Amino acid sequence: MATAFKLNSLTKVMLASLLVTQGSAWADDDQNSRKSMDTIVVTGEKTEKSLKETMSSVAVVDKSLLENGQLASISEALSEMANVVVLTGSVPDMRGVSGNGGATGFNSFSGGSKARVSTLIDGVSQPFVADLTGDTGLWDVEQIEVYRGPQSTSNGRNSIAGAVYMTTKAPTQEFEGAVRVGYRNQDSYLDTAAVVSGALVEDVLAFRLSTQYVDGETFSNPPVYETNPTDRELNKLNTSSTRAKLLYTPSKDLAVQLTYSTYSEEGNSGRKYFLADEPFDYEPLYQRIMDTESDTTQVNVDYKINDDFSLDVLVAYMDYKWGFEAYEPLESAESDVSMDESNITVDTKLNFGLSNDFYSGFIGLAYFDRDQDFESVGATNYYGDDSSKSTAVYGETSFNLSRELTLTAGLRIEREEQLRNFNMAFRGDMLVEQLDNSHTLRLPKLAIQYDISDETTLFASARRGYNAGGGALDFTAEDYYYYDEETVNTYEIGSRSVINNGDINISANVFYNNFNGYQALSSERKITNIEDAHSYGLEVEAYSMLGDQWQLHGGFGLLKTKIDESSAFPDAVGNDLNSAPELTASLGLSHWFTDSLKVNLSANYVDEFYGDLTNTEERVAGDYTITRLSMTYDTEQWLISAFINNALDEEAYTSQEPVSGRYPQGYVAVVNPQTIGASVTYRF
């Protein structure tokens, strides 16, 4: 692979376009255009800021991109972002850091490993177990914020690579509602959704009730084995979700919101690998019927104490179930796996200096408690339990040193504890192991921001990220082993510009990451700590109007990574991190024929990247361009949309595993094939 950054034709065109598109006005809000950065409010760093004021590298998917049904899952919504790679059955990889980390597959059970990217919905962290499921369905979502780089100071656990923060819509005082029906050409794929909201007691009590049901099939072609016939629907995927909110506002200073949400997904979800001899026949390497259920009850309290102080409280309880039934050529080779989790989240934050011209900030207390029980029955037999908890005090203060200059300092001190029991019938014996981990960590953050004009802001920041150590089973050595925590020090400089009254928006971040103890999967498939590795790169995103009826939007990411030192994994020294394409780029163009009728065309390019840390050529993937096309008719009452995903029907790999004794045909993961769909939404 190339040793220097390279620009393909897509990026050259995009850069040239960004340089020449000056002037003109943004389309009106009712034309469903992208918002200006200074009007987008993000909340994923424990405080409300405009996107222009945020010093992290943040990309936002707002409701204008979510409402037409073209994006079916969180993974699809993130796939066009700079320096983000979405792999099958995985949380997103950011800046060359595997989002799953050591938590992929069996390691998630044997050692309770944690993912490196946290996903939060309305402030509540979502569990990740072995294989990504449960991210389908984006109905009634306000926006998705994607933070690249460590967010450990804000979120603590499993945020060393970044965080995805999703906000759902709040109850309204005005009565409103909507229903939607959507269809895709994936064999009877039907998406139905509805929402209703309004006041029960005027200005005092409001509600919101939303629901979505997706019934369809995936693009896999699973065979039914003659040696083990079944009547199970191997390719079905059914998803249902319901969310109810009740907002109580007895005064202008107090708001209490009760939320209950339930989610279930069953069928052909998770990782999709296909036999490599005929990969685009989509015959799966293995077959599993996944089952995910989640029930969450949460209370949010926002109380304004006086002009200087306010209090935010979040209390949430979650019941979470994850599992699968395997389907194999022989019934004796099948296993049924299940995991039950209950967890409690408490986060209390005091905001201060709300009316102070010199300083403002917050201090908070956070508590998380998780209990798990898991088992596998059948060809593979194991069981165990897990008790994990964390307690943290965190805070952040900003000092306005002058009208233009602001200094921000933050710190999180967190105590993490984990006790995990793992028992497995292994080669004639019973393996009994225990992981007993506890650690106190300090996660600082320092940033400085300078407003060089009303239009442009510059900033520089430094922060620290952390992910806990764990344990895992080495099948080859017949040994249960332990590995240490990993940390990263991240340094960034960047700028945000909103030019010509919001006509042009440009965001840029330059970053450097220094990793210590990076948790890596060795060539023996053993999680190993790499003493020293680094990465650096750039993210640029921009939006601009071209006249009154055209809008250009694009972005690109440049990335270089290197493993500098590893005594336990010497073959990897000097290599790239896996899932680290040197270039990711996107370019889109929107045109309004009328105030209501809009067409959008976008393309996303992902450079080639290695699939392992030994950088074997047989595992290189990437080097593909995915194109999307949509046409939307949007009025006060109707939203009618037709779209094509992967419009040019690109065939490419996101993962490759060569032929071996274990996999005589090899296997691959592929980009989703061309999909044509439409949706109709009626608002009232």
Which positions does each model-derived feature cover?
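N-terminal periplasmic accessory domains that precede
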Residues: A77, P92-D93, L120, G134, ...
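Short acidic/polar hinge/loop motifs at secondary-structure boundaries
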Residues: A82, N107-G111, R116-V117, D122-R148
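Transmembrane beta-barrel wall of Gram-negative outer-membrane proteins
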Residues: E176-A178, R184-G216, S220-N221, Y225-G267, ...
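Outer-membrane beta-barrel domain signature, strongest for Gram-negative TonB-dependent receptors
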Residues: D231, N235-R370, E492, N505-S507
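Structural signature of Gram-negative outer-membrane beta-barrels, strongest in the C-terminal barrel
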Residues: L246-K252, T259-S261, A366, D386-N513, ...
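Membrane-embedded beta-barrel scaffold of Gram-negative outer-membrane proteins
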Residues: N300-K304, S310-E328, D451, T457-S461, ...
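Gram-negative outer-membrane beta-barrel transporters
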Residues: L407, R415, Y512-N514, N529-T614, ...
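C-terminal beta-signal and adjacent terminal beta-strands/loops
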Residues: Y605-D612, T632-F684
